Amino acid sequence: MADRLSRSRRRLIQAGLALTAGAAAQPRFALAAAAGARTLRIGYQKGPLSLLKARGTLQDKLATLGVNVTWTEFPSGPPQLEALNAGSIDFGDVGEAPPIFALAAGAPLVYYAQTPAGPSTEAVVVAKDSPVRTFADLRGKRIALVKGSNTHFLLVRLLQAAKLDHADVKPVWLSPSDARAAFENRSVDAWIIWDPFLAVVQQTLGARIVADGTGLVENRSYYFTSRAYAQRNADVLGVAVSELTTVQRWLDANRAQGAAEFSKLWGIPEPAVALAFRRARFGVEPVTRETLAYQQHIADVFYQAGILPKRVDVSQAAPPTLA
């Protein structure tokens, strides 16, 4: 398995690395003229892409290929994939559920790379003085979360594990910022959220975790693109994945320094970022057939629960690099 993953990773970045090496030996303006004007429009959330943007290494390397990079921040995954479907971005990162809803809506997305699983990086939290002790105690209660996000799938799995029906709880669909306000003013009884928002509410409000994703979900992040962009710009995506890999490896080896940097980037207290980083698993991996099988499982669970109006075939979103 390790050899197969290594080969897949090499295929994923090979085109980009080869062209980058060639670019170093030629004048930048000549390459830009030869390649024509190209753009990589990146959507990102609070994660490693934030650091990649701040460091500027991706912009510098892609400039040698005549590629301009633009960045747009999003509060969560679903609006990122809406932007992809609308043709507004080319690349980004989302959790494990948004691609399913995007595929159901006809988005031409491709899973391009993934991170290691991080089930403990999303959780259900309640106020520190709440009488709720288990997820089952939330029967009849109002739960804030982002519709179509990774936390939506966690809600479904928590309901299954507690042997509750969807009608037994009252989802309140809110963005992370609106959910934070609702949680703080007690207009909801619980909040299902991911890091770093999870760590912040623990650190600043003393929120208590009732359940996390351990044993229920994988909770990976996925780097996505459109099929058309992948077919035309394998070199660009190869460089992007290579630079992301460098950033993620650095974060894995320098968590304390990374927490300090992200605290400044995000405007979040450093202890909260450090808490989130203690739960995080950094890295970039190639998408595998096992990955797609798990994503198909998510799609099937949503369909069987009546959340999706039709079945989704995840195989249509397989990356061109899949062996």
Predicted regions, residues:
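Short, glycine-/small- and polar/acidic-enriched structural segments
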Residues: 33-165, 172-173, 189-192, 210, ...
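Pocket-lining segment of extracytoplasmic ligand-binding domains
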Residues: 97, 171-172, 177-262
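Short, surface-exposed acidic
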Residues: 68-70, 166-169, 266-277, 309-315
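Sec/Tat-exported extracytoplasmic proteins
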Residues: 62, 88, 93, 103, ...
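Solvent-exposed, polar/charged alpha-helical surfaces in well-ordered, non-transmembrane soluble domains
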Residues: 56, 60, 82, 86, ...
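N-terminal export signals
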Residues: 4-5, 11-33
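Secondary-structure end/capping motifs
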Residues: 232-307
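Conserved C-terminal helix/tail region of periplasmic/extracytoplasmic solute-binding proteins
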Residues: 302-323
